[in-house]
Amino acid sequence: MTRVKRGFIARRRRNKILTFASGFQGSHSKQFRVAKQQKKRALISAERDRMKRKRDFRRLWIARINAAVRFSGLSYSQFVYCMYKNRLSQNRKNLAQIATLCTPFFSTFSQKIMT
């Protein structure tokens, strides 16, 4: 059987993974086997945390809207129900920005929705 010299291809594959892991600490950035495992873990964590970030921001927006709506004597769920009843659709991100930046406008808006 003939000898297969695949140094370039193998080296390119290893260098690609080691370059990805270059910011990791200790042997996680130096040794190929460890770096390969850490790259796998890093990509899994990155995907998980991207999904978690969406949940966290939604919770933050709801908390901000709820805090602003409480001044009008409503709860968040009542506010959303009033918006649904009046056929108003606005996403939570925009509502939270309005609630934090334009508080007087948001309070009059929530009062109008209530009636």
From Swiss-Prot:
GO cellular component, one term: ribonucleoprotein complex
Any GO molecular function: structural constituent of ribosome
Subcellular location: Plastid, Chloroplast
GTP-binding in keyword set: no
Main location: plastid
Coiled-coil ranges from the UniProt annotation: none
Signal sequence coordinates: none
This protein's UniProt keywords: Chloroplast, Plastid, Ribonucleoprotein, Ribosomal protein, RNA-binding, rRNA-binding
InterPro entries referenced in this protein's UniProt entry, alphabetically: Ribosomal_bL20, RIBOSOMAL_L20_CS, Ribosomal_protein_bL20_C
GO biological process terms held by the UniProt record: ribosomal large subunit assembly; translation
Pfam families with a match to the protein in the record: Ribosomal_L20 (PF00453)
Keyword Ribonucleoprotein: yes
PANTHER family: 39S RIBOSOMAL PROTEIN L20
Family per similarity comment: Belongs to the bacterial ribosomal protein bL20 family.
General function of this protein: Binds directly to 23S ribosomal RNA and is necessary for the in vitro assembly process of the 50S ribosomal subunit. It is not involved in the protein synthesizing functions of that subunit.
Name of the protein described by the UniProt record: Large ribosomal subunit protein bL20c
Species of the source: Gnetum parvifolium
